[in-house]
Amino acid sequence: MVKLTSIAAGVAAIAAGASAAATTTLSQSDERVNLVELGVYVSDIRAHLAEYYSF
């Protein structure tokens, strides 16, 4: 399982790279894209954990 620190590092790297090359398009299979998606999923699960357990 990917640690949240590596997700945060990936997001920070993308943010730093985005400011340097704002027009760069990443492919869907790029690891940085996958790390951001995973970070969003983890954040959503944490925010709605009680709702998930209620089902």
UniProtKB/Swiss-Prot annotation:
Cited PANTHER family: CELL WALL PROTEIN CWP1-RELATED, SERIPAUPERIN
Alphabetical keyword list: Signal
Lineage: superkingdom: Eukaryota
Signal found in the keyword field: yes
InterPro entries reported for this sequence: SRP1_TIP1, Yeast_SRP1/TIP1_CWP
Gene symbol of the encoding locus: PAU7
Signal peptide range in chain numbering: 1-20
Family per record: Belongs to the SRP1/TIP1 family. Seripauperin subfamily.
Pfam family for this entry, one: SRP1_TIP1
Record's protein name: Seripauperin-7
UniProt key word Cell membrane: no
